[in-house]
């Protein structure tokens, strides 16, 4: 309801003062995106007994907020008197919700209820869960979850999806391959991952949790009683928050592991998927060492997990138990951070999905990707004082803009910093030791190093200067992209191979994944030698190919601009050359082939289509691309069917995990001179 009365206009003027406070907070204090929360009590409005909730955040940092806030009001049976929404130039949205006692006579203590609503606002900001948790088979369909319970439900479902197969098989097949070949190990690992993905879908997990909502609530209460901050607890029932009263009353929590086990065995078939899913939920509870779930001002929800409970020593997929795991979930993303020792460093990677299908694939593999990146980083860091770590964030489908990724990165960093504040009374710390994380740039985060460094400073972190490598020299750092530290490492291997094989003056046809917009891809182009002729480039925008050779000056122009290959001047292509955008549909190519889907063509070009358009490729330097892009399902495409030789004589794996280990061995056996990722880009680690 928008009002133009003089009284309301005066209130709007008062909002300007609030906005000034928010601007100062965004500049000098911790939270920069929101939400900013303020409760104006009835003492300021005695004449009409009016209460006011003021909620502000930056546009685009969450979704469906107004709808969700109204659901929150409905849950507490609160009626609004009027609502104002004001927008400001910085993209700031400011909601003013007005309530009167006359409209809410049925509420015993309106002040307490509104205070509770304000506390739970950050939950709907962090996790905009629009639909109610409903299962047609649910016998308790009239049992309504609280906002906190809904959030716990959503978070638990995400955790279970990623970790459930590790919880199912304590052996994980490790004994089967103890004395076997790497090829057999990779095949078994692949089948195990497929089994997990086909057996436990997101929908199945959500349906099972919905079917046993009361059990989920019992586990939530166990979680809440463990992690509810003591500063928020009080024996005075009038001072207790409504959420804490709900935790203490109603459904009883589980008081012991034995009680949970007995309940599960009595109510669930131990041969059913339900049994394993609910066991996994209990394991999630047990593994949480600290969380910001009950901190009011949060941008995302973070958990520090005990890795010994979620990774097993005898694991085929995970050969070592990490030192620490963080799990973060926000409005537009979720992610992990894995490190192998207390003091460890590694980059943070943001994964974007340009189609629903690619999102599902990225979702299925992101935990394995994060683990393998951290594990590889640990091996690369063996000659320096810091061990290895890595973080991977997966953006929700549809969120691919630069601003969306920056917002997600801010939330990821902020929520982890929340629970690095040692001995803070705002959360319960079951770990009990001080810990510091050290980040670095990776895919889609290189431009955020300065931002995150200054953000840590604004949060009051004493270690802010060492928080990230790759920051600008003005902050005491060495920008990785500017000085090309990883690129120089990769190029050294490429040029050394040329020298060893006597190819330094020989014309070589080169293919590259990872385009001129990326750190590694752009520098690889700028550092390329005169004897290299680019015949193909694949990046996030599409596929650029010319068997006669791409224009090197044009590629350098794009690399200096950090532009994607869709900006390439196509008038410079030969008659055989072409560019296919990921947005293209039903495009006819010079050889007569029709590309029905540009995204699928891009994703499969490095394998299925590469040799159809480029019969000769002498050098392949992956500078980007998804993990396991060359795997057991497509390795035969890289081998000559008649001779058994590798179709590409030289591969220097600049991108991490691009080729699976068994395929590396097959390519080497087929005569390929191959430098694996941990060797090719290790120079960047050492110099950074």
Please describe what each predicted stretch is:
Residues 1-90, 96-159, 166-175, 180-182, ...:
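Regulatory modules associated with amino-acid/nitrogen control
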Residues 469-558:
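Hydrophobic, well-ordered beta-alpha structural blocks that scaffold small-molecule cofactor pockets
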Residues 49-51, 346-354, 464-479, 578-593, ...:
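Gly-rich Lys/Arg/Thr-decorated short loops/hinges at beta-loop-alpha junctions or inter-strand turns
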Residues 273-319:
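Extended, Lys/Arg-enriched charged tracts that mediate electrostatic binding to polyanionic substrates
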Residues 401, 497-509, 528-531, 547-558, ...:
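Non-transmembrane, aqueous-exposed alpha-helical and coiled segments at domain scale
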Residues 95-98, 403-406, 432-440, 450, ...:
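Terminal amphipathic helices with adjacent charged low-complexity linkers/tails
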Residues 161-162, 170, 333-337, 360, ...:
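Glycine/serine-rich phosphate-binding loop and adjoining beta1-alpha1 elements at the start
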Residues 68, 360-363:
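Long, Pro/Ser/Thr-rich low-complexity/intrinsically disordered regulatory tracts in eukaryotic proteins
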């Amino acid at each position: 309801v928008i009002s133009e009365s003089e009284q309301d206009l005066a209130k709007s003027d008062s909002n300007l003062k609030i906005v000034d406070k928010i601007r100062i907070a965004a500049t000098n204090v911790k939270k920069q995106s929101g939400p900013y929360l303020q409760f104006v009590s009835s003492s300021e409005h005695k004449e009409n007994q009016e209460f006011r909730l003021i909620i502000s955040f930056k546009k685009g940092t969450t979704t469906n907020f107004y709808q969700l806030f109204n659901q929150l009001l409905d849950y507490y049976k609160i009626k609004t008197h009027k609502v104002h929404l004001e927008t400001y130039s910085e993209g700031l949205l400011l909601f003013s919700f007005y309530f009167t006692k006359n409209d809410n006579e049925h509420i015993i203590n309106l002040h307490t209820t509104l205070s509770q609503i304000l506390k739970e606002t950050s939950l709907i900001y962090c996790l905009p869960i629009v639909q109610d948790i409903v299962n047609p088979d649910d016998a308790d369909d009239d049992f309504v979850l609280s906002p906190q319970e809904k959030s716990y439900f959503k978070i638990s479902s995400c955790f279970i999806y990623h970790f459930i197969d590790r919880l199912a098989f304590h052996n994980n097949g490790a004994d089967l391959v103890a004395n076997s070949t790497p090829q057999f190990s990779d095949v078994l690992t692949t089948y195990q991952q497929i089994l997990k993905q086909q057996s436990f879908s997101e929908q199945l997990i959500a349906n099972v949790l919905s079917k046993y909502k009361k059990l989920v609530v019992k586990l939530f209460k166990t979680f809440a009683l463990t992690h509810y901050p003591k500063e928020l607890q009080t024996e005075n029932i009038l001072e207790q928050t409504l959420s804490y009263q709900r935790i203490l009353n109603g459904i009883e929590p589980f008081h012991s592991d034995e009680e949970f086990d007995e309940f599960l065995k009595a109510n669930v078939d131990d041969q059913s998927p339900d049994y394993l899913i609910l066991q996994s939920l209990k394991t999630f509870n047990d593994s949480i060492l600290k969380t910001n779930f009950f901190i009011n001002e949060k941008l995302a929800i973070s958990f520090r997990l005990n890795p010994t409970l979620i990774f097993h020593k005898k694991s085929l997929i995970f050969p070592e138990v990490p030192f620490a795991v963080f799990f973060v979930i926000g409005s537009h993303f979720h992610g992990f951070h894995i490190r192998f020792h207390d003091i460890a460093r590694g980059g943070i990677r943001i994964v974007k999905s340009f189609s629903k299908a690619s999102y599902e694939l990225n979702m299925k593999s992101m935990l394995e990707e994060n683990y393998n990146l951290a594990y590889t980083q640990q091996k690369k860091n063996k000659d320096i004082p810091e061990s290895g770590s890595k973080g991977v964030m997966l953006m929700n489908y549809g969120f691919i803009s630069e601003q969306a990724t920056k917002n997600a990165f801010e939330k990821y960093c902020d929520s982890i910093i929340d629970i690095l504040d040692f001995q803070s009374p705002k959360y319960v710390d079951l770990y009990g030791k001080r810990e510091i994380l050290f980040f670095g740039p990776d895919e889609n985060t290189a431009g955020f190093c300065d931002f995150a460094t200054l953000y840590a400073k604004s949060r009051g972190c004493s270690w802010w200067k060492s928080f990230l490598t790759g920051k600008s020299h003005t902050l005491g750092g060495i920008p990785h992209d500017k000085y090309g530290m990883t690129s120089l490492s990769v190029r050294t291997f490429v040029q050394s191979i040329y020298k060893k094989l006597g190819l330094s003056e020989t014309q070589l046809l080169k293919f590259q994944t990872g385009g001129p917009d990326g750190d590694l891809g752009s520098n690889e182009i700028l550092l390329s030698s005169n004897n290299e002729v680019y015949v193909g480039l694949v990046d996030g925008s599409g596929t650029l190919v010319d068997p006669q050779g791409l224009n090197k000056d044009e590629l350098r122009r794009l690399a200096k601009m950090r532009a994607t290959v869709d900006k390439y001047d196509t008038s410079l292509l030969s008659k055989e050359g072409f560019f296919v955008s990921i947005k293209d549909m039903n495009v006819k190519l010079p050889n007569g082939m029709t590309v029905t889907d540009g995204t699928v063509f891009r994703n499969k070009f490095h394998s299925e289509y590469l040799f159809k358009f480029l019969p000769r490729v002498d050098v392949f330097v992956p500078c980007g691309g998804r993990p396991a892009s060359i795997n057991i399902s497509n390795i035969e495409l890289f081998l000559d069917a008649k001779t058994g030789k590798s179709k590409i004589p030289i591969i220097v794996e600049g991108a991490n995990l691009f080729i699976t280990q068994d395929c590396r061995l097959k390519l080497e056996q087929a005569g390929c001179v191959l430098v694996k990722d941990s060797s090719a880009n290790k120079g960047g680690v050492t110099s950074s």
